[in-house]
């Protein structure tokens, strides 16, 4: 069983199901989905931090709860932003091999500079080291460092401490090839997984963006309907 955690934001609910559909259709192993839904996490007493004016999604910080939500048990698990889609024929289970058991986490180590000053949702865009690294993560939940990712720490740590991985060390962050977090207009080569980080094609401004047809095809399958 491969556990997959997807960040949930009500403004991107269509993207959540589109991503899930693209994962299931090519899966070589059973998939267990958990959606990081902030109201549910808040009601459960797991998330209580105030909204950061710089955060653009509801799951900006809750993504780091993944090891805790797995009870820090052995077995590699995946977190994904919801604004992603797998290319046809891509098996998400291949990702876990990029996170050796002697590492805490594996990510695509982007060198990404945003092209605009506003993020999704209207939040201000801030360039910083390791930007987008946390948008796709393979965790080893039972390592010593991942066990430090408690609800208390995640609710009190700064965005820099979390998203720049100051809770671990550089030597314990494994690298995933960029084809697994491929950004339209930025990444080179052929993608396995496309990340519409500026906005999914469900948003009017990005309806016809690069590789939009891949997203729309998955959306139609997920909804079992035609969209004009």
Description of each model-found segment:
Residues 1-5, 11, 17, 28-29, ...:
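A glycosyltransferase accessory/donor-loop signature
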Residues 62-114, 138:
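GT-A fold catalytic core of metal-dependent nucleotide-sugar glycosyltransferases
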Residues 97-161:
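Conserved catalytic core of nucleotide-sugar-dependent glycosyltransferases
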Residues 31-70:
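Active-site-proximal specificity loops/subdomain of glycosyltransferases
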Residues 46-54, 119-124, 190-192:
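Short, surface-exposed amphipathic charged segments that create phosphate/polyanion-binding patches used
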Residues 20, 24-26:
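Zn2+-dependent metallopeptidase catalytic core
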Residues 57, 95-99, 126-129, 164-168, ...:
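A general structural signal for short secondary-structure junctions and capping/turn motifs
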Residues 9-13, 79-81, 127:
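Generic detection of long, well-ordered alpha-helical segments
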